[in-house]
UniProtKB/Swiss-Prot annotation:
Residues 8-64 form a coiled coil. It comes from the Eukaryota. Pfam families: vATP-synt_E. Its main location: membrane. The modification N-acetylmethionine is found at residue 1. V-ATPase is a heteromultimeric enzyme composed of a peripheral catalytic V1 complex (components A to H) attached to an integral membrane V0 proton pore complex (components: a, c, c'', d and e). Subunit of the peripheral V1 complex of vacuolar ATPase essential for assembly or catalytic function. V-ATPase is responsible for acidifying a variety of intracellular compartments in eukaryotic cells. The gene is VHA-E2. It is found in: Vacuole membrane. It comes from Arabidopsis thaliana. This is V-type proton ATPase subunit E2. GO terms for cellular component: cytosol; proton-transporting two-sector ATPase complex, catalytic domain; vacuolar membrane; vacuole. HAMAP family: ATP_synth_E_arch.
Amino acid sequence: MNDADVSKQIQQMVRFIRQEAEEKANEISISAEEEFNIERLQLLESAKRKLRQDYDRKLKQVDIRKRIDYSTQLNASRIKYLQAQDDVVTAMKDSAAKDLLRVSNDKNNYKKLLKSLIIESLLRLKEPSVLLRCREMDKKVVESVIEDAKRQYAEKAKVGSPKITIDEKVFLPPPPNPKLPDSHDPHCSGGVVLASQDGKIVCENTLDARLDVAFRQKLPQIRTRLVGAPETSRA
């Protein structure tokens, strides 16, 4: 083999090595690009997933805040609604209390009312001896009806006539002073309080007490008629 053949063979080997190197380099480049693309996609998906998670979290926070705000507003509305009911009922009760003050002005009817209240109290107590308290201003009227009240009670209860003692040491409070409308002093619009002699059984039959009982018993109907359906029925 002469020098020309050797040189030619060497050149062929060089070209082969170079081609193989270029192919290997190209493979490496392609592989690297594929790995880069895969990693880039993974990073992109990870970023998208994080964004979705952040969005979902913030969306839930907004939803929770909306629910809290709605609940707060709903509770505030209910409180206002109930306050409006209370205001109307209180105004109605105050008006009725003022009307009670005029009951004792009608002497004849008030006299009959006192007798009825005494009889009713005796029927509740069913005691042979009782202590009666009234307003000092009503003492004479009470004295004028006691005997008739005792007789009617005895007939209804089919018992002997009870002993009724008027408490002349402690009277029920007087009516409120119209000149002092904001006064919180105890007052009584009329009526009587009867108790057993030992004080263990008491029947409060004042006009004010009866008004309180009537309002407690009729409060649901009063609220419905004055303000509307109860809050529970609107839900």
